[in-house]
């Protein structure tokens, strides 16, 4: 009987001990989350049980059957939870996330990627956030019922913590309905799987825009080259002082490519000839007053994009 007890105890200790990358042994606590909750009873910790990470019915989650619970993310906590003698300091938890993090960004993200890297469309390594050493916990909040960065109404504020210029642009008179809570940043950007320069949700800017603005996609009988090339040639997607989120006022925007030379920009006289010198900005009017189909036209006589 004593031999059997010894064998069982040895097996238990073996399951509670793993080897770290450095060859050292790290001890897991014997009672999982119960050990942690004996001290960590604050609301910010208990909120974990309202979210997806603590769902006991999800076999993929940290609290699924046979999983390591808190230690699946925070690493082995046996030493941290052990009784501390008077005068000694309690060892730090293996991986602490977010503010006051003691682990490197690589260690923090490694804990998350251990599960989430298998998600469809997920490609963290090499994208802009990874290259700038952004930790998952800088954007995500796990100990909560609803992660703010996953909610349309709250996601922009999380992004704006770093992207201050975009916050300012969104305050301009003409912008996507971000502030109204009708769309979020991830409608256009993919922070995890994008490989494009600006981390677009699709491979290019135009493909991303056309997801919503399908009527501008074409193909058209009469194309407007800047539209086919890059929507950003004419539009400021984060906000503008001009209708249609144009990057400049109509005449100046158009004349950044089109010269006014040879264009009747003043009222003609009785002979159909200009009466005075042409105004460089067409009397302050807007090219779009006449060239209404600026994205392209399928009209047989629409080569000038006027119908």
Annotate each language-model stretch with its function.
Residues 20-307:
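Short sequence/structural segments immediately N-terminal
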């Amino acid at each position: 009987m004593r031999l059997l007890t010894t064998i069982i105890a040895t097996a238990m200790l073996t399951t509670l001990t793993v080897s770290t990358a450095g060859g050292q042994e790290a001890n897991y606590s014997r009672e999982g989350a119960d050990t942690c909750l004996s001290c960590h009873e604050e609301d910010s910790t208990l909120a974990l049980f309202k979210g997806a990470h603590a769902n006991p019915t999800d076999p993929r989650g940290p609290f699924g059957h046979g999983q390591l619970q808190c230690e699946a993310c925070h690493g082995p906590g046996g030493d941290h939870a052990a009784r501390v003698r008077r005068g000694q300091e309690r060892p730090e938890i293996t991986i602490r996330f977010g503010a006051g993090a003691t682990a490197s960004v690589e260690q923090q993200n490694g804990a998350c990627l251990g599960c989430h890297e298998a998600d469809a469309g997920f490609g963290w390594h090499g994208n802009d956030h990874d290259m700038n050493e952004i930790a998952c916990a800088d954007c995500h909040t796990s100990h909560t019922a609803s992660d703010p960065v996953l909610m349309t109404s709250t996601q922009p504020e999380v992004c704006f913590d770093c992207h201050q210029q975009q916050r300012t642009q969104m305050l301009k008179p003409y912008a996507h309905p971000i502030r109204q809570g009708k769309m979020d940043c991830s409608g256009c950007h993919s922070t995890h799987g994008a490989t494009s320069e600006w981390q677009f949700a699709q491979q290019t800017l135009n493909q991303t825009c056309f997801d919503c603005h399908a009527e501008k996609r074409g193909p058209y009988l009469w194309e407007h080259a800047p539209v086919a090339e890059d929507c950003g040639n004419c539009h400021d997607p984060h906000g503008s002082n001009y209708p249609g989120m144009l990057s400049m006022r109509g005449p100046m925007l158009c004349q950044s490519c089109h010269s006014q030379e040879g264009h009747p920009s003043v009222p003609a006289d009785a002979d159909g000839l200009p009466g005075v010198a042409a105004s460089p900005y067409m009397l302050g009017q807007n090219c779009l007053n006449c060239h209404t189909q600026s994205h392209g036209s399928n009209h047989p006589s629409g080569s000038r994009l006027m119908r």
